[in-house]
């Protein structure tokens, strides 16, 4: 159903006055966006109003559900107990690609990871940028991307290739030049519907709404984390606030590096650089030549993934398992295997 212009005006006014949409209203707004039933001016106004008012978990969950339905999986979903590791971006910290390193490390430790990612949001180099630079074919056919999982235990879903419904909104989002609700929806709409997820947020006010959105979407297990010092992943700079989703319930905790047998380190120890620099860091780190801080921040975040995946029941054990894998260089082997599996020569 498409609402009348007056109805949309009233709803916009509701948002501008601090109101929150019901699940049904948020659903209708997203459906209208995808159907191009709103003018660019109306769409821009709604995006700005949502950004100004702040995030609501019910709205996010409803919008994500619509996007999921609009992006059906073009091949059979694997039944491997999948997990995803990603962040909302927007922390502006210019760290190296931590969540990308975590995906390959977690795979080397026994998790099965379907990483859903894109090009840079705020950092200098996004996950897609660095992986493409290391030779991954980002636009491999969907069946090829999925079929890589049994052997490699990790694959990469380049978001623009999997969400054709969002193509028409891309020019407007780009012209606005600011982060919108769509930046938060990206981590919620992995096309392979992972059973578990570690989701990093750049500000602590996103912890509860993102956890609520995951709960409303039926996520089995998840950890939503805001990194000490302002990262959108667990940090070594101090205790990290988290929301843990398990069996339909969300609980709040704090997890410090010391809890996992790791040492605190400043954010400067995690700095990245340009594309070439970040590629070098990722290759050295995954092949056993990373610095202590690089190894330990990846181990910290990998521990969360291993718990979500059910591979480890204890965060500390998970961190130590990740450190052992990194020291052996086995995560780099996973990346090499995935690069070969996604090669154009492998396309059928």
From Swiss-Prot:
Q: Which Gene3D superfamilies match?
A: Nucleoside phosphorylase/phosphoribosyltransferase catalytic domain, Transferase, Pyrimidine Nucleoside Phosphorylase, Chain C
Binding site residues for Mg(2+) 2: 232-233
Which transformation does this protein catalyse, written as a reaction? N-(5-phospho-beta-D-ribosyl)anthranilate + diphosphate = 5-phospho-alpha-D-ribose 1-diphosphate + anthranilate
Q: Where does anthranilate 1 bind?
A: 87, 118
Q: Name one GO biological process term.
A: L-tryptophan biosynthetic process
For this UniProt record, give its keywords in alphabetical order, as a comma-separated list: Amino-acid biosynthesis, Aromatic amino acid biosynthesis, Glycosyltransferase, Magnesium, Metal-binding, Transferase, Tryptophan biosynthesis
Q: Name one GO cellular component term.
A: cytosol
The residues the record assigns to binding 5-phospho-alpha-D-ribose 1-diphosphate are: 87, 90-91, 95, 97-100, 115-123, 127
Residues where Mg(2+) 1 binds: 99, 233
Q: Which GO terms describe its molecular function?
A: anthranilate phosphoribosyltransferase activity; magnesium ion binding
Q: Can you quote the record's cofactor note?
A: Binds 2 magnesium ions per monomer.
Needed cofactors, names only, are: Mg(2+)
Q: Which Pfam families match?
A: Glycos_trans_3N, Glycos_transf_3
Metabolic or biological pathway, per its Swiss-Prot or TrEMBL entry: Amino-acid biosynthesis; L-tryptophan biosynthesis; L-tryptophan from chorismate: step 2/5
As for family, the record states: Belongs to the anthranilate phosphoribosyltransferase family.
What exactly does this protein do?
Catalyzes the transfer of the phosphoribosyl group of 5-phosphorylribose-1-pyrophosphate (PRPP) to anthranilate to yield N-(5'-phosphoribosyl)-anthranilate (PRA).
Protein name, per record: Anthranilate phosphoribosyltransferase
> What organism, scientifically named, is this protein from?
Synechococcus sp. (strain WH7803)
Lineage of the organism: Bacteria, Bacillati, Cyanobacteriota, Cyanophyceae, Synechococcales
Per the record, the gene is trpD
